[in-house]
Amino acid sequence: YKWQLIPATAYLEYERTGNRKIMEVPYDANRQALNTLMLAELAEGKGRFIDQLLNGAYMSCEMNSWVLSAHLPRQSSKRSLPDFREQIIDLGSGGYGALMAWVHYFFRKPFDKINPVVSLQTY
């Protein structure tokens, strides 16, 4: 899977035009890929998907927020770029957090063998 970057302009598109899809399509694809890779590795158990899981977990931790752009105007700034200084939650970010908790729970040990920084971020 090729992890998709969500640029600032994808978040801003909601504020500019009301288009949520430009941010949500890659967000949903990345989240679905992480979920699928987790289930595939749990089913197979051969380590074939660990590197991609590590990439997805690391990339997810690098995001300022897992909240959808259409819900970010709930921040005090009322803007659509995530402000790392203010934490808000929506159903999508709650689901993403739950997925990351499962990824951490099941794959902490294999991640630690590669580099413990990823497990520290997902904790």
Regions found by a protein language model. Name each.
Residues Y1-E15:
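Low-complexity, Ser/Thr/Pro/Gly-enriched N-terminal "stalk/linker" regions
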Residues G18-N19:
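Intrinsically disordered, low-complexity acidic/Q/S/K-rich activation/interaction tracts characteristic
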Residues E24-Y123:
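Aromatic-lined, polymer-binding surfaces characteristic
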